[in-house]
């Protein structure tokens, strides 16, 4: 803090950027709140235009492979690409960004909830039905809590029903929505070429 105050006094334009889970680790080790002294900037997945300009992708490729620039060089070897997404992105996000930084009593349940969310992405699924499909699920509050963690990690969201009645919104069944379509594709057995010739599956 002394060095920071000194740089500020000397009008030295210094900015410190914490990316990924490091911002959460910093908050855990602080005795101060840093109120008014930091700004959160959301850096989401790459858009179609960005992936098109950088790698020449078309719309179908973007729908299947998603907006992860780090995996773009692997799409010609889809088995390797799927392992990269599962191991380097999904597993790392759950194991490090969530499990190491927050208290999760049932990590296996959270992983199964994520897999279920990928399977039902774009669909509404009640918490009661989730309890029926997930072993040792506990209660709906636990599932809702874990779903919020997955949303914060940029993996899976549970979109609430849009209504002017706040009570009905809070009590509504969530609509699963993955943050990136690659999270679904990496769990499917089909390749990009195989899925695009199946109108029922491709949509």
Regions found by a protein language model. Give the residues of each.
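Alpha/beta-hydrolase-fold catalytic nucleophile elbow
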Residues: 19-20, 179
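Active-site catalytic pocket residues across diverse enzymes, especially alpha/beta-hydrolases
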Residues: 4-8, 30, 134
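Surface-exposed charged/polar residues within alpha-helices that form helix-capping/stabilizing sites
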Residues: 2-5, 61, 115, 132
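Accessory nucleic acid-recognition modules appended to NTPase machines
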Residues: 83-203
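Conserved Walker B catalytic segment
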Residues: 1-17
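Short, glycine/charged-enriched secondary-structure capping and boundary segments
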Residues: 2-3, 30-35, 191-193
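Interdomain motor-coupling "hinge/lid" segment immediately C-terminal to the ATP-binding subdomain
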Residues: 13-14, 21-23, 27-124, 157
């Amino acid at each position: 803090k002394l060095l920071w105050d000194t740089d500020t006094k000397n009008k030295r334009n210094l900015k410190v950027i914490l990316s990924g889970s490091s911002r959460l680790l910093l908050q855990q080790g602080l005795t101060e709140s840093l109120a008014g002294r930091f700004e959160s900037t959301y850096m989401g997945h790459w858009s179609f235009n960005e992936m098109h300009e950088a790698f020449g992708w078309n719309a179908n490729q973007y729908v299947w492979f998603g907006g992860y620039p780090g995996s773009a060089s692997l799409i010609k070897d889809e088995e390797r690409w799927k392992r990269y997404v599962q191991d380097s992105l999904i597993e790392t996000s759950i194991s490090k960004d969530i499990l190491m930084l927050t208290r999760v009593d049932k990590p296996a349940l959270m992983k199964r909830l994520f897999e279920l969310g990928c399977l039902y992405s774009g669909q509404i699924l009640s918490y009661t039905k989730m309890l029926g499909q997930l072993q040792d699920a506990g209660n709906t509050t636990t599932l809702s809590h874990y779903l919020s963690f997955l949303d914060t990690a940029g993996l899976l969201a549970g979109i609430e029903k849009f209504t002017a009645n706040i009570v009905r919104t809070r009590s509504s069944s969530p609509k699963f929505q993955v943050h990136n379509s690659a999270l679904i594709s990496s769990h499917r057995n089909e390749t990009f070429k195989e899925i695009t010739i199946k109108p029922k599956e491709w949509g």
